């Protein structure tokens, strides 16, 4: 069963189809595991270190490449007006937001951590999804919950370190 509608864009034009499919499969599995509503949407973009660096600089004031960035539509930022989802009809799908992954950073980290690129891409995708769902790791207690759930999902899928 397909829970998520994923709008996937590979800006690198280099990511093998099997890697894209793996990430989509992991996100679908995670969505079912986390009991996300059927028909929920998100966008997933694969980019380069330079591409994610530009986004990181523009939106987070950090002039460096990172592995994954998530933009949650359901999260309120400073000065933003809360969306009243009750105004929309029941046919309007839930849109979680955007996950952006640097494939170059994923390859670097896979080598550093001694596991496969597939495992790293899966980890980053689930990490991004959890951010879209409101999980964070700014505080030690939040980190414990988020990273524990991340490991639980990846282990249940069979993508262990």
Swiss-Prot record:
Pfam families, A to Z: YbeY
PANTHER family, sorted: ENDORIBONUCLEASE YBEY, CHLOROPLASTIC
Superkingdom assignment: Bacteria
InterPro entries membership: MetalPrtase_cat_dom_sf_prd, YbeY, YbeY_CS
Cell location: Cytoplasm
Keyword vocabulary terms for this entry: Cytoplasm, Endonuclease, Hydrolase, Metal-binding, Nuclease, Ribosome biogenesis, rRNA processing, Zinc
Annotated GO biological process: rRNA processing
Source species of the chain: Listeria monocytogenes serotype 4a (strain HCC23)
Molecular function GO terms recorded: metalloendopeptidase activity; RNA endonuclease activity; zinc ion binding
Chaperone is among the record's keywords: no
Designated name of the protein: Endoribonuclease YbeY
Principal subcellular localisation of the protein: cytoplasm
Protein task: Single strand-specific metallo-endoribonuclease involved in late-stage 70S ribosome quality control and in maturation of the 3' terminus of the 16S rRNA.
Cofactor list: Zn(2+)
Top-level EC class as recorded in UniProt: hydrolase
Cofactor stoichiometry and binding remark: Binds 1 zinc ion.
SUPFAM superfamilies, A to Z: Metalloproteases ('zincins'), catalytic domain (SSF55486)
Family per record: Belongs to the endoribonuclease YbeY family.
Entry's EC annotation: 3.1.-.-
């Amino acid at each position: 069963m397909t829970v998520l509608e994923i709008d996937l864009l590979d800006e690198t034009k280099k990511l093998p189809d099997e890697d894209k499919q793996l990430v989509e499969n992991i996100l679908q599995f995670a969505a079912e595991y986390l009991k996300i509503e059927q028909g929920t949407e998100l966008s997933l973009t694969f980019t380069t270190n330079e591409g994610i660096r530009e986004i990181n600089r523009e939106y987070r004031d950090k002039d460096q490449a990172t592995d994954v960035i998530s933009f949650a539509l359901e999260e309120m930022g400073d000065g933003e007006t809360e969306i009243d989802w009750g105004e929309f009809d029941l046919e309007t799908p839930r849109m979680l937001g955007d996950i952006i992954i640097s494939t170059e950073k994923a390859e670097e980290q896979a080598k550093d951590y001694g596991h496969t690129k597939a495992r790293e891409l899966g980890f980053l995708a689930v990490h991004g999804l959890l951010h879209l769902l409101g999980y964070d790791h700014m505080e030690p207690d939040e980190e414990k919950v988020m990273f524990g759930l991340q490991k639980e999902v990846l282990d249940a899928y069979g993508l262990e370190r």
